[in-house]
Amino acid sequence: MGICLSAQIKAVSPGASPKYMSSEANDSLGSKSSSVSIRTNPRTEGEILQSPNLKSFTFAELKAATRNFRPDSVLGEGGFGSVFKGWIDEQTLTASKPGTGVVIAVKKLNQDGWQGHQEWLAEVNYLGQFSHPNLVKLIGYCLEDEHRLLVYEFMPRGSLENHLFRRGSYFQPLSWTLRLKVALGAAKGLAFLHNAETSVIYRDFKTSNILLDSEYNAKLSDFGLAKDGPTGDKSHVSTRIMGTYGYAAPEYLATGHLTTKSDVYSYGVVLLEVLSGRRAVDKNRPPGEQKLVEWARPLLANKRKLFRVIDNRLQDQYSMEEACKVATLALRCLTFEIKLRPNMNEVVSHLEHIQTLNEAGGRNIDMVQRRMRRRSDSVAINQKPNAGFARQTAVGVIATAYPRPSDSPLFV
């Protein structure tokens, strides 16, 4: 589905990753892939797993909540259909006046779209059974005649994709600290799915499916392609190849064999996008740089070349120790040897350690800047400061824009 449950963005994204062999919809920004017809056999409420956490809405209720699905309520569009902004009462979950109650995002299935009832049903059943801080909350659904709708919590910050790749005043580039926070949150969501009583393979982990709340907490959305993992003595699930080009694990593409380690590979691609600010596939780049993993893989293992991969908008925000650890983790996730890939619990542990380093670095920055402010009181007013300096901290060399006296021997 891949539609942002967030602020209205309709511009087409250049160079976005295409879909392949998939009834999965395009991302919220409308680039198109081949059509898959919707199945027409009868559908009933009996297909939906019982969940006390979900409300069954009538079509009339959602029509009222979205002001009759008015065009100016559209948040995004994709293969599933359109997403509309609406309002409901927090207690009764009935439609409320615009600007009052709880803001919701309503996905309305387009019967001529690329996704159908099975994807809709998977979304209802998985999100209806699961509750986790890093999974988007499904409030309810509507299954009435030909109508298929999903009702979610509203995610005001939009998708990670938009924050990494959009340009303009609406989306500001994410800071290094926020990127680590989002990467960790998404990893926790994926780990939760893999650790379920019957593991769940997400199968379409990508930046457009990672949504951000007002505090930049990451939440996984779009479970239309999710599958139960192998059970008993089975090592994998065999399935038709579906997903998004540039994110799928090579062994899955070659054999159709799906495991939780397939998700780990996809996570590695996203982590590389977070580190580099580049898309997994970008046809607008030079031929040798269009496929991010192929281009970056040899650079990630070389500390002297790693700077070529790191997003230049992150200049002076990170230590080399942090960057190297993120690069090493991405490489491990992207290895061709399935058994050598970490599981998502290990990924979470590594990222928590990196986040601790980042927080320690931030404290050191504050301490050094306080010291420098005290020293600056004794510096002659006519001394001209330079643009910045580098300092050694417990987590490595970190650059800062704090000015330094040009002729002071303390900074040689």
UniProtKB/Swiss-Prot annotation:
Q: Without the gene, what phenotype results?
A: No visible phenotype under normal growth conditions. Leaves of well-watered mutant plants have increased relative water content due to decreased stomata opening.
Its main localization is membrane
Descriptive protein name: Probable serine/threonine-protein kinase PBL10
User: Which PROSITE patterns does this one have?
Assistant: PROTEIN_KINASE_ATP (PS00107), PROTEIN_KINASE_DOM (PS50011), PROTEIN_KINASE_ST (PS00108)
Q: Which gene encodes it?
A: PBL10
Residues carrying lipid (N-myristoyl glycine): 2
Specify residue ranges for compositional bias: Polar residues.
23-43
According to its UniProt record, where is this protein located?
Cell membrane
Q: Which organism is it from?
A: Arabidopsis thaliana (Mouse-ear cress)
GO BP terms: defense response; positive regulation of stomatal opening
Gene Ontology terms, MF aspect: ATP binding; protein serine kinase activity; protein serine/threonine kinase activity; protein tyrosine kinase activity
**How does this polypeptide assemble, per the annotation?**
Interacts with the Xanthomonas campestris effector XopAC/AvrAC.
